[in-house]
Amino acid sequence: VVLLDNYSLLTEVVANPTAYGFSNATGVACTVSSSLFCSANTLVTPDAANTYVFADGVHPTTAAQKLSAQYALSVLKAPAQVGVVGAAAMTAGQRYAQRLMSYAPNVSDQAWHAFADAGYSKTDFGKAADSKNKYLLVGADRRISAGNVHAGLTLGYDRASGDLGAAAGEFNLKETSVGAYVGKKADQGAIMGYVRYGRLSADIDRNIALGAANRTESGSSKGAHYTIGVQGNLVLGTFANGKVKHGPVGGFAYEKMRLDGYDEAGNTSTSMSFGAQKREGMVASLGYQLRGEFGKVKPYASLSYEVDGTDADNIKARLKSAPTSFSTEAPKSDNGVRLKLGAQIDLAKNVNLVVGAERTFGKDSGQQTVFNLGVDARF
């Protein structure tokens, strides 16, 4: 059962009718005693059904009923709309693993290795909901044993902005993260394990159309994001006189994310309270890659199938004026294919420029485009 507050809504409309597209909130549209017997022939003016708030002493006009329907629909859609923020938060953990492996080939027998990577990504969740993300990731590692085994730490900052849906509102999401990783590189391939922890902060603006008026309800939430996983690749062979290596590439990770529940700041008929958002589960990928070495330029390409096994709890919500809540499903990401293209370019001895682009295919929700640019050094 979803409880609405039509009384407060109509009270707000009566207090400022012109804002909602009405010209009369004190009189009635019908010349007969009850709207049950009212018709186009018994209106006080031909357009009274669209300009008056009340048809008789109790019942709303056609336009006021349409406004009430907009109100009800906005309440029903609200939990799934704010759920886009939780879905957007999950993309940072998956991107982290991709970026670490972009720099793994440059680890050598030098004692230290450091990198900095910046990028942009856009994720589409369907129904005009999306997330546009800018990020910066820096890391440093040290060789801890013979055989190119390195261990390191990372610091990251992600900032996302996006739409909750078509004209449904916007959000801003920030995540500050720390991570640790250990990896080994050999002629036959590389493997890396990692952990990551991020603190989340979100500002959410939800738009509601009510007749001629557009209202915005705002709120804020904080949370946490955990990731642990492993990535690796193997070299099965070469061609082009040994200049191009090829072999499988894959990864496996567990992610958990929570955004705290929050109350919107307003105290109107449309102001709502939302429960916590929780997502967790496994993400896996398996594919094949090519990696070339042509002098100072080392291009790479890979094609992988990704399985997103994360589950999201239903999101609870209620009007702030209502005693009980209801829940709806949160947006989910789909399985799909990821294509990666890029290159490493030698800028100087032990210094490399890394450029890359990624695109997923076959996803109704979670379709993603990524661009990154970075530099790393060994010393």
Language model regions located:
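Outer membrane beta-barrel translocator domains of Type V secretion systems
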Residues: 85-245, 254, 340, 356-378
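Glycine-rich beta-alpha junction loops
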Residues: 7-10, 250-256, 303-309
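Outer membrane beta-barrel transmembrane domains
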Residues: 114, 151, 179, 183, ...
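Sec-exported extracytoplasmic/periplasmic mature domains
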Residues: 12-19, 69-78, 233
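Extracellular low-complexity, Gly/Ser/Thr-rich intrinsically disordered linkers
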Residues: 36-95
